[in-house]
Amino acid sequence: MNSIKFPVLDRTTKNSVISTTLNDLSNWSRLSSLWPLLYGTSCCFIEFASLIGSRFDFDRYGLVPRSSPRQADLILTAGTVTMKMAPSLVRLYEQMPEPKYVIAMGACTITGGMFSTDSYSTVRGVDKLIPVDVYLPGCPPKPEAVIDAITKLRKKIAREIYKDKIRPQQGNRCFTTNHKFFIVRSTDTGNSDQELLYPPSSTSEISTETFFKYKSPVSSHELVNSGGF
């Protein structure tokens, strides 16, 4: 087999040529121009909004806040996600173009926070709805912590392969029984038809014993006679 001899490059040519791969170039362009979607439901968004000011200046990271999901590739779920807000969040995520990333910001977003014990209307973890890339704990996280989370996301983007990013994400995304959602195949189906498994019961279906389970120690007749009103 004939050996192939490559031409010897002079010093000037070596200093003006950068060798890289198309995948690395794509990763560099994406990590340098993350456009976050303005999505906030609680106090954590106040900390994120402070990044826009001159003190932290998150423009130096190439972050451009957008109000449309079709122009964003990053969403920071800042704040509590309620049951009524869950379908809207999934719809916003589905409308974002690929590749897209998610940062779960705050304890309420990650685990439900202080609402995770006995709340009937709070989603206990946003990762039950959409895939999460970076978890940012705190109540609320400081702006410095948000910058650190964005830095970690940039490092993750720098070493990822695009084929791995567009693979089918979680063939079956399951919703907890407590939240009473249907089990759907994927969040990236283009449909946002998550509905409650059981329709809410009306007040007419509630028995009198259940409705008046906790009675006042003073009857209404005694309260009227004593002039309490």
Curated annotation (Swiss-Prot):
GO terms, biological process: aerobic respiration; electron transport coupled proton transport; photosynthesis, light reaction
Transmembrane segments: none
Cofactor(s) essential for the protein: [4Fe-4S] cluster
Its membrane topology: Peripheral membrane protein
Cofactor note: Binds 1 [4Fe-4S] cluster.
Record's GO cellular component terms: chloroplast thylakoid membrane; respiratory chain complex I
PANTHER family listed in its UniProt record: NADH DEHYDROGENASE, NADH DEHYDROGENASE [UBIQUINONE] IRON-SULFUR PROTEIN 7, MITOCHONDRIAL
Role: NDH shuttles electrons from NAD(P)H:plastoquinone, via FMN and iron-sulfur (Fe-S) centers, to quinones in the photosynthetic chain and possibly in a chloroplast respiratory chain. The immediate electron acceptor for the enzyme in this species is believed to be plastoquinone. Couples the redox reaction to proton translocation, and thus conserves the redox energy in a proton gradient.
NCBIfam families reported in the protein's UniProt record: nuoB_fam, PRK06411.1
Name by which UniProt lists this protein: NAD(P)H-quinone oxidoreductase subunit K, chloroplastic
Organism the protein comes from: Aethionema cordifolium
